[in-house]
Amino acid sequence: MSSPELLERAMEGFRLYEEGDYPEARLIFEELAQQDPLEAYYRTALGAIYLAEDELDAALEAFDEALKLNPKDSAALVNRGEVHLRLGNIMEAAQDFARAVDLDPENKDPLTMRARLLAAAAIETIEAAQRSAPAELKK
Protein backbone atom coordinates (compact mmCIF):
# COMPACT_ATOMS: atom_id res chain seq x y z
CA MET A 1 0.00 0.00 0.00
CA SER A 2 1.11 3.54 -0.69
CA SER A 3 1.38 6.14 2.06
CA PRO A 4 -1.95 7.79 1.10
CA GLU A 5 -3.64 4.37 1.17
CA LEU A 6 -2.16 3.61 4.59
CA LEU A 7 -3.39 6.96 5.87
CA GLU A 8 -6.85 6.34 4.45
CA ARG A 9 -7.00 2.92 6.13
CA ALA A 10 -5.79 4.42 9.42
CA MET A 11 -8.51 7.06 9.25
CA GLU A 12 -11.08 4.34 8.58
CA GLY A 13 -9.76 2.33 11.54
CA PHE A 14 -9.92 5.38 13.79
CA ARG A 15 -13.50 6.08 12.69
CA LEU A 16 -14.47 2.49 13.51
CA TYR A 17 -12.75 2.79 16.90
CA GLU A 18 -14.64 6.01 17.62
CA GLU A 19 -17.90 4.26 16.70
CA GLY A 20 -17.07 1.41 19.09
CA ASP A 21 -16.59 -1.18 16.34
CA TYR A 22 -13.45 -2.54 17.99
CA PRO A 23 -13.24 -5.86 16.11
CA GLU A 24 -13.21 -4.15 12.70
CA ALA A 25 -10.84 -1.40 13.90
CA ARG A 26 -8.53 -4.06 15.30
CA LEU A 27 -8.39 -5.87 11.96
CA ILE A 28 -7.45 -2.68 10.17
CA PHE A 29 -4.72 -1.69 12.63
CA GLU A 30 -3.31 -5.21 12.76
CA GLU A 31 -3.05 -5.12 8.96
CA LEU A 32 -1.46 -1.67 9.04
CA ALA A 33 1.05 -2.73 11.71
CA GLN A 34 2.12 -5.60 9.47
CA GLN A 35 2.34 -3.35 6.40
CA ASP A 36 4.40 -0.68 8.19
CA PRO A 37 6.17 -2.20 11.19
CA LEU A 38 8.02 1.02 12.03
CA GLU A 39 4.91 3.18 12.51
CA ALA A 40 4.22 3.60 16.24
CA TYR A 41 0.71 5.00 15.74
CA TYR A 42 -0.67 1.65 14.59
CA ARG A 43 0.51 0.00 17.80
CA THR A 44 -0.86 2.87 19.89
CA ALA A 45 -4.21 2.45 18.15
CA LEU A 46 -4.15 -1.31 18.77
CA GLY A 47 -3.33 -0.65 22.42
CA ALA A 48 -6.30 1.72 22.69
CA ILE A 49 -8.56 -0.94 21.17
CA TYR A 50 -7.28 -3.60 23.56
CA LEU A 51 -7.73 -1.19 26.47
CA ALA A 52 -11.30 -0.46 25.41
CA GLU A 53 -11.94 -4.21 25.26
CA ASP A 54 -10.35 -4.73 28.71
CA GLU A 55 -7.51 -6.83 27.27
CA LEU A 56 -4.97 -5.20 29.56
CA ASP A 57 -1.98 -7.48 28.88
CA ALA A 58 -2.36 -7.07 25.11
CA ALA A 59 -2.80 -3.31 25.56
CA LEU A 60 0.36 -3.08 27.65
CA GLU A 61 2.32 -5.01 25.03
CA ALA A 62 1.04 -2.79 22.20
CA PHE A 63 1.87 0.42 24.08
CA ASP A 64 5.34 -0.94 24.94
CA GLU A 65 5.93 -1.63 21.24
CA ALA A 66 4.69 1.83 20.27
CA LEU A 67 7.00 3.48 22.80
CA LYS A 68 10.00 1.50 21.54
CA LEU A 69 9.30 2.99 18.11
CA ASN A 70 8.47 6.48 19.42
CA PRO A 71 9.41 7.22 23.04
CA LYS A 72 7.64 10.60 22.79
CA ASP A 73 4.22 9.18 21.89
CA SER A 74 2.15 10.89 24.57
CA ALA A 75 -0.99 8.90 23.70
CA ALA A 76 0.89 5.65 24.24
CA LEU A 77 2.35 6.96 27.52
CA VAL A 78 -0.97 8.13 28.95
CA ASN A 79 -2.79 4.98 27.88
CA ARG A 80 -0.01 2.70 29.13
CA GLY A 81 -0.16 4.61 32.40
CA GLU A 82 -3.87 3.89 32.58
CA VAL A 83 -3.23 0.20 31.94
CA HIS A 84 -0.64 0.18 34.73
CA LEU A 85 -3.10 1.95 37.01
CA ARG A 86 -5.79 -0.64 36.29
CA LEU A 87 -3.28 -3.45 36.87
CA GLY A 88 -2.30 -1.95 40.22
CA ASN A 89 1.18 -0.90 39.05
CA ILE A 90 0.85 2.53 40.61
CA MET A 91 4.50 3.58 40.40
CA GLU A 92 4.78 2.62 36.72
CA ALA A 93 1.55 4.49 36.03
CA ALA A 94 2.81 7.61 37.78
CA GLN A 95 6.07 7.45 35.79
CA ASP A 96 4.22 7.24 32.47
CA PHE A 97 1.94 10.13 33.40
CA ALA A 98 4.91 12.24 34.51
CA ARG A 99 6.72 11.56 31.22
CA ALA A 100 3.60 12.55 29.25
CA VAL A 101 3.29 15.79 31.22
CA ASP A 102 7.01 16.52 30.70
CA LEU A 103 6.51 16.20 26.94
CA ASP A 104 3.90 18.97 27.00
CA PRO A 105 5.06 21.63 29.49
CA GLU A 106 2.66 24.21 28.00
CA ASN A 107 -0.33 21.87 28.46
CA LYS A 108 -1.45 22.17 24.81
CA ASP A 109 -2.31 18.50 24.27
CA PRO A 110 -5.66 17.38 25.77
CA LEU A 111 -3.97 14.14 26.75
CA THR A 112 -1.72 16.08 29.10
CA MET A 113 -4.70 17.15 31.19
CA ARG A 114 -5.81 13.53 31.38
CA ALA A 115 -2.28 12.54 32.38
CA ARG A 116 -2.25 15.18 35.12
CA LEU A 117 -5.59 13.97 36.48
CA LEU A 118 -4.56 10.32 36.39
CA ALA A 119 -1.19 11.14 37.94
CA ALA A 120 -2.97 12.91 40.79
CA ALA A 121 -5.17 9.84 41.27
CA ALA A 122 -2.09 7.57 41.27
CA ILE A 123 -0.35 9.76 43.84
CA GLU A 124 -3.48 9.83 46.01
CA THR A 125 -3.61 6.02 45.85
CA ILE A 126 0.03 5.77 46.94
CA GLU A 127 -0.49 8.25 49.78
CA ALA A 128 -3.65 6.47 50.94
CA ALA A 129 -1.80 3.15 50.95
CA GLN A 130 1.03 4.70 52.96
CA ARG A 131 -1.41 6.20 55.48
CA SER A 132 -3.20 2.90 55.97
CA ALA A 133 -0.03 0.79 56.21
CA PRO A 134 0.73 -0.64 59.65
CA ALA A 135 3.21 1.42 61.66
CA GLU A 136 5.86 -1.35 61.43
CA LEU A 137 5.94 -1.04 57.64
CA LYS A 138 6.40 2.74 57.73
CA LYS A 139 9.77 2.53 59.47
Residue ranges and their predicted role:
Residues A45, N79, M113-R114, L118:
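Canonical tetratricopeptide repeat
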Residues A66-L87:
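Mid-chain, well-packed structural core segment of small domains
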Residues M1-E5, K139:
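Long, contiguous interaction/recruitment modules in multidomain scaffold/adaptor proteins
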Residues E92-Q95, A119-K139:
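Alpha-helical linker/edge segments of TPR/alpha-solenoid repeat scaffolds
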Residues E18, A52, R86, L118-A121, ...:
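Register position in tetratricopeptide repeats
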Residues L6-K72:
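Alpha-helical adaptor scaffolds
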